[in-house]
């Protein structure tokens, strides 16, 4: 249970830090810094533990590279959703359903068994996404961030990845990143499936190094193409927040891995699944975000579904 709590805390804090990073430094710089720090930590672990790469053949390596690129797509979609003004609690809850995507793929492709609790969890998570993503009816659910409050709602006016654009007022803050959050969940889910399928053969550390190394390599290769279009002024704090997001995300991943190694997979997965509660509370307290009743019910359904998937 302790590993699950540490993982939940790490991933929850990482989501809050990611929002600050995305809105201060832009998506590209934020993801590059966060992913780069993650690779540095993995390299340090590799130097300490000296894992074997004997299981990383050509086919396995290509699959892990694919997992890394899918993960990169997920990160870009997640940070972009936050940069566009999506509510961090809502975006985090929807993107967290990637576990359900991976579970369904494991059942459909690998023939793994999904219990009753897991099945109910998948249904709850999908229903929660439908509620959270639905447009509010005219005159209903008007308690959202962009309708009555009109306070600190922020949107993005410059649609260039990596650019830190000027803020502008929007009408519905909490729905701005929903489509991107769904893309994030799908990318994470498919990437996680590939990573989970080939990690036993390659070893978890070797697999993580190949996957994360591929994503950072692509980001570095894209740097010359985007350099002239980036807004470098005022991004120092954003880079610091991105580093914090990468560090806390790595803490969550390591805690989750340790929980699995200790034979506490179900408990660790179930407890860590509640991590969207942290960005949800953080969004309300730190950023004055307010979800509509329908969206809040959807988020609760998503979290409940994730817990059941972890137990199932």
Please report, for each region that a protein language model flagged, where it lies by residue.
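Membrane-interface interhelical linkers
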Residues: 1-9, 17-18, 23-28, 33-66, ...
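Structural signature of hydrophobic alpha-helical transmembrane segments
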Residues: 1-11, 55-71, 114-127, 203-217, ...
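Alpha-helical transmembrane segments of compact multi-pass small-molecule transporters, enriched
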Residues: 36-44, 94-108, 214-218, 252-255, ...
